[in-house]
Structures are given as structure tokens and as C-alpha cells.
Amino acid sequence: MSKPLRGRHQARKRAVDLLFEAEARGLSPAEVVDVRTGLADTNPEVAPLQPYTAAVARGVGDHAAHIDDLISSHLQGWTLDRLPAVDRAILRVAVWELLYADDVPEPVAVDEAVQLAKELSTDDSPGFVNGVLGQVMLVTPQIRAAARAVRGPRDT
């Protein structure tokens, strides 16, 4: 059972890498996914992206404005552009999971983000990420309910 969970952790970590790369290169997450997929298709030494990695990166790109607005509204004393780029990417992955990944329990999304912050960012980042996501979690049920209402029962 730990194998799939570890696989998801690696997929999230790779999604953070892709989002970081997209921002650094001025590309959309979908463009970076396409480039990486093309490299894997043409070069056997390049590992293909896991489907969950591509889904997360594309999902963050598709909902970037909403995700960034939600993160920004829960930052205290910070602006999104002042955060370290890796923290932005971690928060974006976690918020996408909180809002759009129905198969990921909210505490798992937060715990995974905190773990990624421990692995990839500064000593202060895990606590910061946990605090921001704790605040976001307070409003995600309402956001999900509103999205379901807009989509209607046949689209869920």
C-alpha cells in the first residue's frame, strides 16, 4: 500500500518541479508538460511523466487565477510574488488538490505539501505552508459546493 502513496508523493514533487520550471522559463504549465512528454517520447533515457504529475500541472495551469487568488487572500504579511518560487509551486499543487482532486483527502494534501516544503525549501517553509493551507481548508468546502452547484448534478 505504501507504494502507490510513495508514487503520488513523487508525482507531486515532480509537479512542483514542473511548475517551478514553467514560472522560471515564462511558460505555461501545460507547455512544460508537453515539452517533457515530447522529450520522453523521443528519448528513451528520459522517464515519462506520471499521469498524476501531468494532471496536477495542467490543472494548476487551468485554474491558476483562482488558485493564486485563494492563496493570496490567505497570506498574512506576504504577497504571492514575494514568496520563494518553490513555496508558490508547493502551495499551488496543494490548493489544486484541495479544490479539484476529489480522491485526495484534505489532510493528505496539506501533509504532502508540508513534507515537500521540508524536502525542497527553507526551514521556515513547512510551518508557513501548513498555516496558509490550514486557512485555505476552512473555505474549500464552500468553494467545492459552489462549483458543484454551477456545474449541476449531471456534470459531477
From Swiss-Prot:
N-terminal signal peptide = none
- Can you name one GO molecular function term for this protein? RNA binding
Listed under GO cellular component are: cytosol
Pfam families to which the protein is assigned, alphabetical: NusB (PF01029)
Listed A to Z, the keywords are: RNA-binding, Transcription, Transcription antitermination, Transcription regulation
* CDD domains attached to this UniProt entry: Terminator_NusB
| Superkingdom of origin organism | Bacteria
Biological process annotations from GO = DNA-templated transcription termination; transcription antitermination
The record's function comment reads:
Involved in transcription antitermination. Required for transcription of ribosomal RNA (rRNA) genes. Binds specifically to the boxA antiterminator sequence of the ribosomal RNA (rrn) operons.
Concerning PANTHER family, the annotation shows: ANTITERMINATION NUSB DOMAIN-CONTAINING PROTEIN, N UTILIZATION SUBSTANCE PROTEIN B-RELATED
What family is this protein classified in?
A: Belongs to the NusB family.
Q: What name goes with this protein?
A: Transcription antitermination protein NusB
